[in-house]
């Protein structure tokens, strides 16, 4: 049996578990009697992820659901393959249904012609709709669903205790998920989602890309100010050629450096 590397009681991040970067961050929520996955990444890493789950001695039949934080291909391209293996349901926001069902290459960010990016996005069916305020019970764990639009209109975040699996809302370096009108991004909505995170009692952010990090309101405020300026900049756009955070992330994973988050005190 492979040792389970919990970053917090009941939470395993599969990149940390693997010791190398598989793609987007994939969170396994261990509720004891059952478990679920938040995102799955690309199809070509599904077999490795499920093999890791087997090696950690999680019964595959005990997978409650696969949650799509949003409809982007880098998070969900492997969903149908994983569903076929695990014989479970796929859960996501109502606004993710159509782009996933149609495999829309623009709305799922599977195709970016200007950057010569193309990922085959097979149609994917959401079985269970989840939205703002819903509670997902998985064994002895509860996840609270937040709808945090901005990067996409179907972006979800999931709260457990004082941790937020925050999707593509913000990363450790203050960057945010790509903003693209063709992809359904909305800057005013994004600002409101970031303000909600800033004003919450969340202590730790578990993003969909890059390292887990402690919530710092100064970082959030700086990002909010930057996005507020974007609303009035006609030259706004992103054609980034590199993202140094992912290089740092690679080093931290391979060196086994990851945060050990203390359980939330209830007294």
What is the meaning of each model-derived region?
Residues 236-267:
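C-terminal regulatory/interaction regions
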Residues 7-14, 113-118, 140:
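Short Pro/Gly-enriched beta-strand edge/turn motifs at strand-loop
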Residues 2-56, 157-167, 171:
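Conserved beta-strand hairpin/beta-sheet module of binuclear metal-dependent hydrolase folds
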